[in-house]
Structure formats: structure tokens, C-alpha cells
């Protein structure tokens, strides 16, 4: 099985790396209240750098298992995160990380907008166990 890869480093070698703005999109048509945009790369295959993204959730929840760390910084609203029986509630300015190899559950009873950083995934292991639900 071939594994899709991205460059080992997402940097361009230039003095400044610039990623132009793009709008957030619904992840899938059947998940209308979950929107995102990946800023510097798509989380496909392996990567040795970080991946930056922005997410919005409107009265919905999401869970997935990821092989890399996932750090969320809440910009607006209120976000609940649960992993391994521990739950935290983020308010604007708060951040939390689900560490590699964990199932993370994220939900916004009303609305949440967050900036997310995926840590390195040098083996290219895939995220899985996706579940979307509306509140």
C-alpha cells in the first residue's frame, strides 16, 4: 500500500512562508455544522512539521482518533473536549491538547471557533473513528 506523503518540512525555504486566506468549508455535506480550513497543508500522509487549521462548530459534536497531538485554541464560544475520561471546558483564550494515540471528543453546545495545531505525524498513520452528531 502506497502512503501519500508531503514534504518532510512544510516550509518553503523562503524567509517568510505565506499562506493566503481561504474560506472555511463544510467537512462533508452530511456534517453541515462542522466547518474547517487547513492553512498550511492538508493532513494527508506523513508530515514532520505542524499543520495549522481553523474550525467552527455550531451545536454539534465530533470525535476521532488521531496518531498526532491536537492542540485547540478557542477564539470564540465554548468548546468541550473529552479524552480518556477527562473533560475540559474551553472559553475564549483557553487552549487544550489531546495527546497522540487518543480518542478525542469535541462538542459545542451553541458555537465554537478555534485554531488547531496538529503535531508531527512522521509515520503517516491515519486518523479514524470519525463521528459527527448534532446537539
Segments the model singles out, each with a brief description of its role:
Residues 1-54, 134-135:
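A short, N-terminal "cap"/entry segment at the start of jelly-roll beta-barrel domains
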Residues 46-49, 109-135:
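Double-stranded beta-helix
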Residues 54, 87-89, 103-105, 111-113:
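Well-ordered beta-strand positions in beta-sheet-rich domains
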Residues 56-57, 65-82:
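Short, conserved beta-strand element in jelly-roll/cupin
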Residues 63-64, 81-82, 98, 104-109, ...:
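Short beta-strand His + acidic residue motifs that chelate non-heme Fe in jelly-roll/DSBH
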Residues 85-101:
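Short acidic-glycine-tyrosine-enriched beta hairpin
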Amino acid at each position: 500500500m502506497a502512503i501519500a506523503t508531503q514534504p518532510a518540512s512544510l516550509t518553503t525555504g523562503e524567509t517568510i512562508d505565506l499562506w493566503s486566506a481561504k474560506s472555511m468549508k463544510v467537512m462533508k455535506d452530511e456534517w453541515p455544522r462542522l466547518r474547517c480550513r487547513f492553512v498550511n497543508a492538508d493532513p494527508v500522509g506523513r508530515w514532520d512539521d505542524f499543520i495549522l487549521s481553523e474550525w467552527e462548530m455550531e451545536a454539534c459534536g465530533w470525535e476521532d482518533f488521531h496518531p498526532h497531538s491536537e492542540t485547540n485554541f478557542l477564539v470564540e464560544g465554548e468548546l468541550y473536549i473529552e479524552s480518556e475520561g477527562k473533560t475540559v471546558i474551553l472559553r475564549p483564550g483557553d487552549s487544550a491538547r489531546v495527546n497522540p494515540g487518543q480518542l478525542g471528543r469535541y462538542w459545542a453546545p451553541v458555537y465554537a471557533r478555534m485554531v488547531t495545531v496538529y503535531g508531527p505525524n512522521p509515520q503517516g498513520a491515519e486518523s479514524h473513528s470519525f463521528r459527527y452528531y448534532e446537539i
